[in-house]
Amino acid sequence: MNKLVVEIVDASDLMPKDGQGSASPFVEVEFDEQRQRTQTRFKDLNPQWNEKLVFNVGDLKRLNNKTVDVTVYDDRRDNQPGKFLGRVKIAGAVVPLSESESGVQRYPLDKRGLFSNIKGDIALRIYAAPIDGGDFVSPPPDFAEKVMKEDKRFESQEFQFQNQNQNQNHYEQFEDEINNMETLKPTKKKEKESRTFHSIGAHAGGGGGAPPMSQAKQAYPPPPNQPEFRSDFMRAPGPPTGAVMQMQPPRQQNPEFQLIETSPPLAARMRQSYYYRSSGDKTSSTYDLVEQMHYLYVSVVKARDLPVMDVSGSLDPYVEVKLGNYKGLTKHLEKNSNPIWKQIFAFSKERLQSNLLEVTVKDKDLLTKDDFVGRVHIDLTEVPLRVPPDSPLAPQWYRLEDKKGMKTNRGEIMLAVWMGTQADESFPDAWHSDAHRVSHSNLSNTRSKVYFSPKLYYLRIHVMEAQDLVPSDKGRVPDAIVKIQAGNQMRATRTPQMRTMNPQWHEELMFVVSEPFEDMVIVSVDDRIGPGKDEILGRVFIPVRDVPVRQEVGKMPDPRWFNLQRHSMSMEEENEKRKEKFSSKILLRVCIEAGYHVLDESTHFSSDLQPSSKHLRKPSIGILELGILSARNLMPMKGKDGRMTDPYCVAKYGNKWVRTRTLLDALAPKWNEQYTWEVHDPCTVITIGVFDNSHVNDGGDFKDQRIGKVRVRLSTLETDRVYTHFYPLLVLTPGGLKKNGELQLALRYTCTGFVNMMAQYGRPLLPKMHYIQPIPVRHIDLLRHQAMQIVATRLSRSEPPLRREVVEYMLDVDYHMFSLRRSKANFSRIMSLLSSVTLVCKWFNDICTWRNPITTCLVHVLFLILVCYPELILPTVFLYLFVIGMWNYRYRPRHPPHMDARVSQADNAHPDELDEEFDTFPTSRPADIVRMRYDRLRSVGGRVQTVVGDLATQGERIQALLSWRDPRATALFIVFALIWAVFIYVTPFQVIAIIIGLFMLRHPRFRSRMPSVPANFFKRLPAKSDMLL
């Protein structure tokens, strides 16, 4: 027989109800018309029960439609009903199906009504399990009342706390009697709506434990965790069917591609001080979004007075740090008896294979075996624990021992050994035991680093005119154009309208430059002699660092005349030209625009919208904290080489990029690294990508393979709430959609300026320069591409490099390329958007056709009220919007959005469409495939052509009403318009509105299935479709 076990652990911070600053709480649990209760804890606002209540379930499938009601009462001594202390409702659909998957969780107590004064939380452990034996039946209500009376009797006789144990022992007799009762008729009670606990409160106390799993989670249950404490908010159930104008649930997609909520043991859930979390201090939340990982740190600082080991009278020392089978080596220093290494080694506590640390000093020998110099043994049981913000541990001198364990006469080594966590400042630069097979030269490719994008600016060049151009052919008037090169960017003006020696262009060209301004702007005036043949008439070199910076809207810098230098002129000729003081000239207005934001991402998921100038940036409004916890079920990316995957993560928000350390040969890596960003605009997106490191041991020209990517919009996150989920890592390949694993993240957005954050929604998305002096649309995509290339080039030159393929994947360089799959996705989005309008039209049609007479009568009444009192129309509309918004609040999304395979049309894309999407530009496919795709595009274009033609026809018919193209139709229309003008003038507006409204809402008995007269008249109007060839 299947059982439901509800373990009541404890409660904390309950509301005092007895008038003396205390309460005597007990817990009553009801499930499927079965009711049980715990013992009473007298005068205790933080009671502990540790009692298990068992209920009959029967079929586990019934859990999905059931609710577990947990209510806390104050046990009163005056034979009156207990006072309400709070309640919790838990949906049966989220109850774990085994004890191993369950964990102790803390639930905030909910109010019974709007004016209830309730606080505190309760710790529960709930799970379903098959248990052999007879059925267990909950006691009837009358027996429960008997138990309560017995408790009250004992409380009145033995109210002092020293006799409390006797009360508990006596109550156990009643509990045994309850367990041995026969099945009795339970009391019927209407099942109320259930709410599911999913999220984590940042202010309340409690740690993380394994949460109840939803139906989506049961397909991929998270690994069991240790029991822990947590604080959760409540989640409303799904919307009822048949509701009008409520949010439509998304289409169900493959459970494999869905989000899975987790509950890792994070320190952020153990906080109980509201002020501590609401202060927004960065240091207060350091490393509270990740699980603590303990490491043994060994800092090898230096050695002194080492003995001579070579015949030449010197030694080449290095240090070997050994712990079990793990061995780390320092670099060897040639001919140095007092070496200084300053290297740190980190050994994971989970993989400690010995209780004795061995540090050996050896002499490097190229020909024979390395010589033994001395060693030190350290017992790990005596290693101190250090956790920041503690000061660094001071290193100590250790005298070296020989192979027999005797102290040597010469040689000492300075070491510092401590046990710490990943929050230690030595963690990023330490040699890790899980990277033991990585050479020292490639060790930097596996470490965590923080990068910053270069500061980008727009360079504006206004080409105005040139004077005194001198072509090579004296009798020819030049056809001049201006070519400008800034870095690897090249632009050119159009040819002037008139060919002359003093041409004018008046064109503005935009470029992207970055700090430090090391580029040179090359402006050349060319004479277009023929197709593909240009002759340089002169050019000028302008250093970008000498260009004035324009901060914001204001006066443009004055244009300047620049001397054009002849391209083929030698130095002597140039000096002679300067003596003559004659040269061709060009008039340019050049400035660096600091008031714009340089777009290096798509505007749909941009992470930064601040202007380039630091002086124009607004203060931050919040803090974004990201905990990169772990991943699971990763695909072996190096399976062809007999290896698994060397994964690392990259996160990008604003101009800050972070890269986690690389974990070798791991399909379920655990990083547990936390990073922080300042937030200036909540309507931004953070991007996290997972990659396979192909340069662990000098991978050459191999590219780091992409495993998957996650994007989260900050505006969809609640403030001061911790989100922990497994995100699917989806990659679209020519063979179809592929899931490469799941990434576990912890996210928290903390608001530091509530007023500024709310005011941000009324401000422009981009700096005001984008609206006052907008950049032409045809230039934006080109400038964005150039900005992406500059960022990728600059980050690839860092050490260790953030490689170009990683940056391009994070920035979605190819997002603008044509994709039939993406086109279908956009069309599906439009149809989903218009579905609401379709539902409204269908609802109105049902009203007009009297499908529901009661609803139609109510609409008649409402219509007459609004016509008689038109001043109520706008208040009614806005009140309706308010009510709908409040109604949908119960069904608001409780999970952050993620990259949806169904919305992207990626789970059922045709293979040929994917092959076309991954095709190069220009195409590299055979001619027959290109012909087939062209024919398909023609077919799609024909359908679009038909729809556009129909829209044009309707518009032209409207124009034909007064154009006299059809004299009879126009005459009828203007006579009709005259009659209606007179009728409306002499008739009150309310009467006209009532007549029109009642006519539209008339009963079907007064309707005809034939088209109406206005529709017939409109369809007979002429259009230009018959004029087309």
From Swiss-Prot:
GO molecular function: glycosyltransferase activity; metal ion binding
Entry's localization field: Cell membrane; Cytoplasm; Endosome membrane
Species per Swiss-Prot/TrEMBL record: Arabidopsis thaliana
Domain C2 per the UniProt entry, residue ranges: 1-111, 277-398, 437-562, 605-727
One cellular component (GO) term of this entry: cytosol
Sequence positions that bind Ca(2+) 1: D310, D316, D363, D365
TM spans (from-to): 864-884, 976-996
Pfam families associated with the record: C2, PRT_C
Main location: membrane
Keywords in alphabetical order: Calcium, Cell membrane, Cytoplasm, Endosome, Glycosyltransferase, Membrane, Metal-binding, Repeat, Transferase, Transmembrane, Transmembrane helix
Region Disordered, annotated ranges: 187-224
Protein name from the UniProt record: Multiple C2 domain and transmembrane region protein 6
Family label: Belongs to the MCTP family.
